[in-house]
Regions:
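N-terminal [4Fe-4S]-dependent radical SAM core
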Residues: 1-82, 101, 121-125
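Conserved Radical SAM active-site core
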Residues: 58-174
Length: 176
């Protein structure tokens, strides 16, 4: 397992948004019982055996994927950044396969309330949520906010992590 020198994903400090790679509304393999799984983008490791390698780095905006998307779900904005239109995406992963950096451009910057709104749609059918990645503990403030919302709704919470966060520095996260 190699530790990266630089973490490429960073939360937007102004509004608390983090890069969300995907939300799986119903999962029976990401923890006990039926749950919603939330995958965040960015990791501080570069493991060869990574289960979700496309979640390690943020898109570098090289644009290699834009013309290759069969559904036109990717475009370059006026600032030269690759943008993603989830409504058009068919989930074929062409963008990931053609990326020279193995990144996924299919992220949405979301705050805890927006993610929980997606989770809440599944509440009658799930027992909890699992947040994974990438490395979800790169975003401890986001996790705390999301878990407060989930616990308040009676849902269990799990973190799927590489274990590098010093939880003693985040007692409020452990208290949730």
């Amino acid at each position: 397992m190699e530790k990266k020198e630089k973490v490429l994903a960073a939360a937007d400090p102004g509004c608390g948004r983090v890069p969300v790679n995907k939300i799986i509304p119903f999962s029976a393999v990401d923890g006990p019982g039926n749950r919603t799984a939330v995958f965040l983008q960015g990791c501080n490791f570069d493991c060869r055996y990574c289960h979700n390698p496309e979640t390690r780095n943020l898109c570098r905006n090289c644009g290699s994927c834009v013309g290759k998307c069969p559904k036109g779900a990717l475009f370059t904005d006026e600032d030269g950044k690759v943008r993603f239109c989830p409504e058009k995406c068919c989930g074929c992963d062409t963008c990931i396969h053609v990326c020279p950096f193995g990144c996924s451009p299919r992220i949405r910057m979301m705050c805890a309330e927006e993610v929980f709104a997606e989770v809440k749609k599944q509440q009658p059918y799930i027992r909890g949520i699992t947040v994974s990645g990438g490395e979800c503990t790169l975003y401890p403030d986001f996790l705390e906010k999301l878990f407060v919302l989930a616990r308040g709704a009676g849902l269990g919470t799990l973190i799927d992590s590489n274990g590098t966060l010093d939880f003693e520095k985040y007692p409020q996260l452990l208290a949730v």
